Amino acid sequence: MSNQHSSTAAPSSYILDSANQPTSFDGNEQGDVNPKPLDHIRPVCNLETQMSNLPTDSVYASQPDGGLVAWLQVLGAWVLFFNTWGAMNSFGVFQTYYESGVLFDRSSSDIAWIGSIQTFCLQAMGLVAGPLYDRGGFKILIVTGSVGVVSGYMMLSLCEEFWQVLLAQGFLIGIAEGCLFTPMISILPTYFSTKIGLATGIASSGSSMGGVVYPIVMKSLMYNIGFAWTTRVLGFISLGMLLIPIIVMRERVKPALRVHRDLIDLSVFTDWPFIVFVIATMI
């Protein structure tokens, strides 16, 4: 009888200390069981504490790899690609208009700085947006970036000088797009595993679609309603579309389960394979 009860599991709210043996029980002939004091049993530690100590890979091990919520993230990312890289791909229309001298008189090389700074800000913002995302700033980045893009277009509609356009389109819109870029490429791997290639491909096609739609809209409106109202229309289009990711996109992996890093992490510059990769990408 005692042997039969010796294998009885401890209550679910306790686990055995690895330094001790399982509890044994003494029973009499009538089948009464008198357990020994459970001195060597300790309470289960908090689940969140246990999970936070797990390797990062284990947190991503249970991606749903599909489902309505997962594909809504793809839709949201598609919209973000449309309004970031898609808008960036249409800068040639802006440059052609600026070179016409209607708004200001500057050389082509000077005008090219607007698009170059916009592209630089979009990618350089990853230095700050990445750690903010890891600290749970997903929604903050999405909302801030969306407001910045819309505000940038509205400010651009008021510009009459080169330096004003440089600030509104190059810096403001560029930084705002950088706030959107990091979340949209970071969220999909938390929802997909085997279908991550398909999901990323669908989402990134938004940049190509934006590069087709934006130039058509701009060419149709620029010489009919003027530069100011054309950029305002772009702002209204962005406002309507960017409400979609704000509403449907959500974090699946909680910030407490992520690996935190400094806001500006300079340790990456000690990773020589990564540095070589970055240099090769630049070339």
Swiss-Prot record:
The keyword Transmembrane helix applies. The gene is eupM. The keyword Transmembrane applies. PROSITE patterns: MFS. Gene3D superfamilies: MFS general substrate transporter like domains (1.20.1250.20). It comes from the Eukaryota. This is MFS-type transporter eupM. MFS-type transporter; part of the gene cluster that mediates the biosynthesis of eupenifeldin, a bistropolone meroterpenoid that acts as an antitumor agent.
